[in-house]
């Protein structure tokens, strides 16, 4: 019985030591820059290939005519590269997709300096669903760096 107790005690101590070591490693793991207290979950559609395609569509299509190259803003439409959303509440990926899909009618534009409507699905570009996902991925990266 004495040997059994000793084995049990050693096993228990080893388990506690291992668990303590795992716990302290996790506690010391670096927090990603800008993550604050909780790490941000990147939407599944925000992939390097989607971002590259979205960049190409945005900056070579009619998006940049209004929003400026790189989404820096222009006379006709707001900047998309900051945290000050004009039409969106949160700037979530889903919200960005929704705006690209439905557009923004002139009477719904919240900035009095800008009165030009944003066409649904990129207006004349008539973006496909995969292209909308790509443009949304690109725009998402402009504000979620």
Feature locations, PLM:
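Bacterial signal peptide processing site
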Residues: 22-25
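Sec-exported extracytoplasmic/periplasmic mature domains
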Residues: 59, 101, 105, 137-144
């Amino acid at each position: 019985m004495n040997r059994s107790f000793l084995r049990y005690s050693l096993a228990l101590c080893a388990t506690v030591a291992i668990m303590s070591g795992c716990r302290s490693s996790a506690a010391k793991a670096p927090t990603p820059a800008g993550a604050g207290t909780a790490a941000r979950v990147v939407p599944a559609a925000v992939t390097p290939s989607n971002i590259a395609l979205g960049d190409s569509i945005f900056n070579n299509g009619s998006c940049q005519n209004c929003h400026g190259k790189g989404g820096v803003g222009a006379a006709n439409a707001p900047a998309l590269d900051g945290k000050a959303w004009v039409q969106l509440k949160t700037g979530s990926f889903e919200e960005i997709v929704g705006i690209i899909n439905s557009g923004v009618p002139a009477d719904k534009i919240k900035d009095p300096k800008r009165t030009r409507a944003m066409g649904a699905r990129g207006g004349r570009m008539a973006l496909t669903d995969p292209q909308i996902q790509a443009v949304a991925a690109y725009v998402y990266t402009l504000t979620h760096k």
